[in-house]
Amino acid sequence: MKRFKINIEYMVDKVLYKTNVFETEHFNIKYTALESHIKLDVTPLVPLEKVTFKMTVPYDFRSNDRIFLNGYQSWTECREHFVDDEPITLNLKQQALRLIKPTSPYGDYDFVKYDRRKGCFHGFSYGYVRNIDHFDFFGSLSERFGYTIIRANVPDREIIFERDLEGVTIKNEYTLIDVIHYKGEENQVYDKYFETMNIQKPRVGRTNGYTTWYNYYQNITEDIVTTDLESLSKVDSKIDIFQIDDGYETFVGDWLDPNPAKFPDGMKAVAQRIHDKGYMAGIWIAPF
């Protein structure tokens, strides 16, 4: 991955600038570029607004390659693609429906530009190109500065890394990209990625849980939760976790904004009642 190029756009004093260099009168970029790791940090000399950034790496795709890119969230369809597949996107009818019903809770349609050409795919944080048992694995080491969007662009024979910087004004040193490229068999590349990120192997034992979803779906209230909690506590349920599922929030996605009409005492009070019964309290915040 030593060979790469960058493109950065930004505004200073309402003037738009576009460049592909590492130093201007407005910023300088320091970088680490190794075969398996690239990191780019920008130091602004003035506040940088409306920044967009991408880094492009050449890649020789082969006809029997398979491409996987991690989805935006758990509702995103994630699978391996053939190099000549069409990207998964909205058709014309679905795009028209977006004018009536926003799609923001269901995917990245509102903030990621889709390339509709065959062989053009995108995902978030990590992905790979697989040829039989050999994996070329690409992964971000940090998403604290914004989502890392990875694009596999087969027609142009390149892999592109972007940082989601919408709404960000860069005033201090900022990590534009921090990605690795590991090669090997599946377990090798994933184990090395987890090791690099210091992610320990989970050591959680088996647990049993109750969720409101399959009885009530979104039609839950504080009274319903309290009634079920009382009922469970009177039987030998062997339940470890009592989970409040979808329906407590005002709208899908607003998980920090409980519906006061349905949960007048608030979620903290409900969680305390769950704890008082000896259960761990769970709450649904999917699709993330």
Segments and roles (model prediction):
Residues 1-241:
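Carbohydrate-recognition beta-sandwich/jelly-roll modules
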Residues 206-288:
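Aromatic-lined carbohydrate-binding/catalytic grooves of carbohydrate-active enzymes
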